[in-house]
Amino acid sequence: MYLRKTQRVRRWISPCGFAACLSFTLLLTSGLPVHSQQSAESTKAAGMDGMRGTQAMPAMPMKGVLGEMKGAFGNWPASREGSGTSWQTDSGPMFMKMLPSVGGFDLSAMGTLQAGYVNAGGKRGDKGFSSNSMLMLMGRKGLGGGILGLHFMTSLDPIFNGPRGVPNLFQNGFTVHGVDVGDRKDPHNIFAEVAASYSHPLSKNFSGFLYGGPVGEPALGGAMYLHRTSGLNIPEAPISHDWFDGSHISFGVATLGLVYQNKWKLEGSLFNSDEPGVKLYGVGRFRLNSSSGRLSYNPSHDWSFSTSYGYLNSDVNQHRLTFSAAYSRALTQGDTLSATAYFGQNIVQGSPKSNAWLAEATYYHAKEAFFARYERVDKSELIDVPPGNYTVNKFLFGDVHNFYSKDQLDYGLGAYAGLYSYPSALNDVYGNNPITFGVFLRIQPGKS
């Protein structure tokens, strides 16, 4: 992530913040499954088509049982679809709440709201309140033999955290009001996605889709960390975020994709790689100044692979290369294991290549979600340290316990800790062996 400026906002929770939080709660608690018998029959027929390997796209494929829902981009389970147009595994758990249909659109909501206390540790680590939130609304309906999709995503981070974001040791630096800020994660924008899509079968084996809008995610990297079933319960952003899924909020996206046999997907995007932070409460200027391409492959229900390349033509021209593998497995007694591994490389002219590795997993067992994440990242954008490219290792682990469930919502309490290793040249700045720890409350739709 490059140094940037964010607009002036008040750091205390304004009346607008309370209204947004209230709307978040009311929206998730008001939705009830509203589907006719005809819709259920359409879904059953769609499932039979999928078993035969056809590309038929039913007009109204959703029904009350989330496991039988189809995606917005093709005739596959909705669980496959991550952020933007990315793929995950089919067998991953769904955390979704059905809403009443409106105007022929089947509506659903996903998301997470996390709020708590964090002490980042060491000489450089801040401590205090921390919030991490993302709310997604999706609508889809049959149109002209294909599927029209509407995609909206918002975050309360700017309201709760302010422009300085939250403590996140070894996160890349950014600038607020002309002041460099390091070891903190900048907030997501209020408008994180405002986009539409249309998918249509082209033949027995091929289907195609279009996706785009004023705010969206290009075909670069994989599913954003709050959308991955392996990472959505982890309350801290990866310090490798800018090597893999850092372009997930772009003010201008247009993507064209081709799918073969519901297993292979090739797509290309034009998008805006300018940093979106200067418009925390609005939408920036629509531009298509960068490009990317991605190849995805789902050989089975449990596996998903992808590789992508992007040219980011912003303040600093950058090339990005990514590889990823995701795995999910439904276990006995309703347990699920979800894991993701990825490699990302950023190349800036005149600078050495920088690499990032990540491996994370979450084990869903009864009311628990045990999580762990390991990262190894080459860092050259740390603030107020001697110039250089430093390899930083981070291991984070914790658990969330669901203590209450009502109206398809789970309320959980979590705790976590983070450990680090890095070159001794940073000891004077970061101290020896800093430890991060935090506690948090999490609200999200229940697992289905």
Predicted segments — roles?
Residues L113-G121, T154-F160, P214-P218, L270-P276, ...:
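Transmembrane beta-strands of outer-membrane beta-barrel pores
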Residues L107, G144-G149, K204-G208, P218, ...:
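Repeated loop/turn-to-beta-strand initiation elements of outer-membrane beta-barrel proteins
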Residues L32-T112, G125-D126, G139-G145, H151, ...:
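N-terminal periplasmic/intermembrane-space "pro-region" immediately following the signal or transit peptide
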Residues P100, F105, G139-L143, H200, ...:
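Residue-level signature of outer-membrane beta-barrel architecture
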Residues F397, G431-S448:
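Outer-membrane beta-barrel "beta-signal"
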Residues G162-S296:
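Surface-exposed coil loops of outer-membrane beta-barrel proteins
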Residues K263-K265, S269, F286, R294-V385, ...:
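Detector for outer-membrane/organellar transmembrane beta-barrel domains
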